[in-house]
Swiss-Prot record:
Belongs to the thymidylate synthase family. Bacterial-type ThyA subfamily. Pathway: Pyrimidine metabolism; dTTP biosynthesis. It is found in: Cytoplasm. This is Thymidylate synthase. The keyword Transferase applies. It comes from Shewanella baltica (strain OS185). The active site is at residue 146. GO terms for molecular function: thymidylate synthase activity. The keyword Methyltransferase applies.
Amino acid sequence: MKQYLDLMKHILAEGVDKSDRTGTGTRSVFGYQMRFDLSKGFPLVSTKKCHMRSIIHELLWFLKGETNVAYLRENKVSIWDEWADDNGDLGPVYGAQWRSWPTQSGDAIDQISQVIAQIKSQPDSRRLIVSAWNVGELDKMALAPCHAFFQFYVADGKLSCQLYQRSCDVFLGLPFNIASYALLTMMVAQQCDLALGDFVWTGGDTHLYSNHMEQTALQLSREPMPLPTMTILRRPESIFDYQFDDFELTNYAPHPHIKAPVAV
């Protein structure tokens, strides 16, 4: 994906060196946007191999409303292990906020069910938003939400989605985030009988960690391959009934995987 490589080049050329919470150090830019036409292929980075299995299982885990890593571990996905406590708990992270945002009255709001109902009944609404940034519960979360909120947009029978990501690890995290929200958009579009529009990614503090520079240079030396195709093989009754085997990725011919340390 040229857009992703262009972002890396932009950070290297225009970014500033900053300290960060992890003590690793970053090169950072503030405010950046990329747009992907989902009708032209699935936006999965090809200049290194991405683990689509982890991306799918993490998204299904979010949609289940779960915040314990047990489901992920059962499916050999370890991307949240560094932040989990001894019992595998992460506090009220994405799944909790998406599916059961607590209200002052003691009720809970299922934002995913709500936004799908709104897309179907009020497609021109400007309030088709899901937020994970619950200020009242940030201190209970193992990690504050990086991909903080997203908005759907319906026009000409097509569904688009824009994600705002307040903090972005460009080398390790961003390929996952783009693919995850592109897939979520496909699922919601199917549930709402809409064609695919764009996925728009907007970043706040968008950075390369200082210990990812060699890996970034290697990735920039590689030529992007054509976009693969993601097919949803089945339409379940609801957004919450998808299974891992419902998704088929074809024509993905990436360059080899590049290892890099995670900043915790």
